[in-house]
């Protein structure tokens, strides 16, 4: 049993402090996840609060058969979709989130500028992916969810997620190579 499930079980048994622990444990990652769909952090925070209100109102819906985090994120995903009804689906990933995944040994100004450019290019490459690809990249690399957990969030089989993850990585690699080639061509002109 994962920590989220254990805390939620305590909440179901009447320990109100457990809800505070759940909120503290998941609020930032859930808000960032929702923000990836709607692109407005303030609205994402409101939706995150709605997710926890749903947990209070619908206490018995989580069966405990799996990890709590995918259950929570699927509620967040559904609420984000409802919020965006009629809007285009685009996942936004902040440069700060992307920056954590790029290496940097030298904190010099030049390296910081190069890193920022790399972050912007990576962010643009991710934004150019199909929505399912953007979503799976976010869940894998920014939320560190397993294929099984992602399958629950995206309501697909684990095999579909495995295939989708492969295609998403290939597509992202293609986007990055394309951008790199365009950059080199511009430098040679």
Model-derived features with residue positions:
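Sigma70-family region 2
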Residues: 12-13, 39, 50-67
């Amino acid at each position: 049993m994962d920590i989220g499930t254990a805390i939620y079980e305590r909440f179901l048994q009447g320990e109100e402090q457990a809800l505070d622990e759940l909120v503290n444990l998941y609020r930032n990652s859930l808000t960032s996840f929702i923000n990836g769909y709607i692109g407005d952090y303030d609205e994402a925070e409101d939706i995150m609060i709605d997710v926890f209100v749903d947990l209070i109102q619908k206490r018995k819906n989580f069966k405990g058969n799996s990890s709590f985090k995918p259950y929570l994120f699927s509620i967040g995903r559904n609420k984000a979709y409802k919020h965006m009804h009629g809007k285009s689906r685009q996942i936004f990933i902040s440069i700060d989130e992307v920056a954590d995944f790029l290496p940097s040994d030298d904190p010099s100004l030049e390296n910081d500028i190069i890193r920022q450019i790399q972050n912007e290019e990576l962010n643009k490459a991710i934004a150019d992916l199909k929505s399912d690809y953007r979503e799976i990249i976010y869940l894998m690399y920014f939320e560190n969810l397993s294929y099984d957990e992602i399958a629950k969030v995206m309501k697909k089989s684990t095999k579909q997620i495995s295939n989708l993850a492969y295609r998403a990585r290939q597509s992202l690699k293609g986007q990055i190579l394309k951008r790199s080639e365009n950059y080199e061509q511009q430098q040679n002109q």
